[in-house]
Amino acid sequence: MDATPMQDAPPADYYSDGSDGLVYGTDENGNKIHHIETVIRNNATREQLLADPLFVANDTTYVVYSNYRRMYGQQPQDANERITINGNMTMDFGPLRLKLGTQAYDYEGNSYSWSRVYGGTDGSFVNEADFTMGYLNARYTISPLSYVKASLSQQTYETTSGNENYLNDIEAYGRRTKTWGSPNYYKRDRTGFNPVAPDEFFGVAGYGSQYTSFDTRKTTTNTISFDYTNQIGYNELKLGASIDNHEITRYGLGASGVARAIAQVDTDLDGLASEQEIIDYAGVDGAKDWRFINYRSLYVTNLGYNIYGDEWSGQYNQDDHMLAPAEPTQSRFYIQDKLEFKDVVVQLGVSYETIDTGAMAPDSDNDGYGDSDGFNNLYFNRQRVNRNGDGNGNYVWKKVKKETATHPRIGVSFPVSDRTVFRANYGTHWQSVPMSYLYLSDSQLSADILAGNATASENPALKPERSTQYEIGIEQRIGAFASLKVEGFYKESKDYLTLANRTEAFTNTGGADTQQNWAQYQNGDVMVSQGLTTNFEMRRTRGLYAQANYTYSEARGTGSYGSQNFYITWIGTDDGYPKAMNLLDYDQTHTANIILDWRSPDATGALANTGFNAVMSFGSGTRYTPSQIYSTVFENRWEFPEGPVNSGTMPAYSNLDLRVDRAISLGGLTANAYISVFNALDSEQVNDVYHGTGNVAEDGWVATESGQQWLANRLSQNPDVDAAAMYQDNLAFPGRWNRPRTVRVGLNISF
């Protein structure tokens, strides 16, 4: 690519005849491929150009793309680096054993974007992440039949992603610069696609386009656990407790909008928005909330920050939506008894568990706790959510109630013969919904309701997802070294996430109600899964360990994931939500795995310290809903179903991974040399299909009447250009497949 400013401006319909001195790539028919864009010199505004009597055509820079060609090999902007440190130390004090350990890593990586490789790679995505963990495990032996275990741990994970050139400098994301060679010299306000050449139609991100979003998150988790075990006659008694406490912060926004807002008022072009410039632009009254309103429109998510990215000050503030970090706590206490009689083993257990998210929600019934119904009536002033309410005790936000549950577990096993054992288990379980669905920032809620766009808001009052599971099966010993297990299972789950409109919601401002209609995550979906699983296992014999398993299953429910109803809520009604139990997106009828691991039993010889591992996996296709054929390139619209929900099946999946390794000694250090081959058979592994055809790389539109008409028009205009093939290029982008055969050669060194 040659992006040097040309001295003479060519005409708008400029097409190279090869005499301009630039080198152009050619397509398979010999046609030159190029792309021209215009960028105003020194990034002057249109108004400045019109007011400049000396403005001439040469004040426009023409960015000329040359050497466009198909390339294969390593993907640009797809590198990553990770440095990991592990360490542990064990101390033995007789009955007391202690183990100290730590792990840490530092990561930085880019993400390949097929649409940016022609001109937008200078402003690509980058992610930086850090993880640290430390733990102390202790075990104290009380007697030969009893012991106590305790554990303390802390881990912190922090990740930041954004534009690789600026990352944390949010105002720089959208700011044009005048320094030649700087990343934002050719900054584009819009990053939409542009034709690569006049005789082609598929688009790429134009030169100067920048990654425009910023996001940073940090989670610190402290865990303490205690377990006691004692064998008393026929009883193996266990009891214990654990507490997990988290602190979660996050901040994210469409960062390029900050500089764009400043540019609206920046009359002296110093890159700043002074108080006087804001007053001149918005008036005295408008200036008071100018900054807030501009940030709110960027759909800021803030937790432990205010809307501007300032860290938690210790006090909630409605003016700038300062919010405290999230501090959820989960605790569990359990007691279990395993009764071992001559002909039967019975396991009885019960756990008492709590989930306290610490999240805030409006209190609709004045019982002192926030609840989901409270979101039907919210108090606003100055276009802001006000968690303090109207000053008369109404619309006040309070902490949601702590969730508690008692979960029984029962297991029974007894021998049918000297080689066969029957087993049956029953238990109830729960899990908190993902934290990302629980914590709602005021700025995002304000934008979701007032901006009028189709959105999906988090819900601090979501309840945990609950399930009840039954298992029954047998285990058969085969010879002296192998066993076969056959087990049937049935699982019912409820309170899964769903998305629904609040059609009877109101916002109150100064005593006046305004009806709103907005979508929020709620509990509601149900799921049932059932199936049969078999597992064959052979203990290591002459160095060989083998395992094979197969599962037949079916998963049905009213929704596969929380946002599945997004298009229904977009319509704005309260009708059309799924009520029937359909096959779920992740329903997979057949899955199977085979593991072979051989470790040389010889201490000396050619194969000493050598190992071989093979893992083969197979899965029948997951589900999708067949839909009408349309152009996924030209038409930006919803899919219209052509069959029952999830009645289509994606292609089956198969994979074979191989690894050979050998331990060697290097000057007193222990090293392990290895060769790993992933997807050794180079099987096609499909991530998604076009729902009109069930094909990974073909949406079926070119074969339709409208597609054929388009193709005829293209061929009449450019008979030497294979329009059908170029349309296909827009469909068959790399992310639709999993990785091809990949070989890694490495060396692990331990010291």
Model-derived regions: residue spans:
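C-terminal beta-signal and adjacent terminal beta-strands/loops
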Residues: A9, V23, A603-N609, N613-R637, ...
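Signature of Gram-negative outer-membrane beta-barrel scaffolds
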Residues: Y72, P76, Y211, K238-S417, ...
